[in-house]
Amino acid sequence: MPKMKTKSSAKKRFKVTSTGKVMAAQAGKQHGMIKRSNKFLRNARGTSELSAPDSKIVKSYMPYDR
């Protein structure tokens, strides 16, 4: 049986930690930051953990990052 392929779009956007959590960057930061509050900009830095249902979907895209 051939090897399963990893979705290229997923490997660019998500990171799986050693404990199995899926981390992703905050959405909505491409443009229009002038009207955002400072609190939003501060909280949007870095990455955040995906919810359990979303993590399950993302992990199916990356069969070797578990």
From Swiss-Prot:
Any one GO molecular function term: structural constituent of ribosome
Superkingdom of origin organism: Bacteria
* Alphabetical list of Pfam families matching this protein: Ribosomal_L35p
User: Which pairs are disulfide-linked?
Assistant: none
InterPro entries membership: Ribosomal_bL35 (IPR001706), Ribosomal_bL35-like (IPR021137), Ribosomal_bL35_CS (IPR018265), Ribosomal_bL35_sf (IPR037229)
GO annotations of cellular component type: cytosolic large ribosomal subunit
Q: Which UniProt keywords apply?
A: Ribonucleoprotein, Ribosomal protein
Which family is annotated? Belongs to the bacterial ribosomal protein bL35 family.
Q: Which HAMAP family match?
A: Ribosomal_bL35 (MF_00514)
Which protein is depicted?
Large ribosomal subunit protein bL35
This protein's species is Jannaschia sp. (strain CCS1)
Q: What gene does this protein come from?
A: rpmI
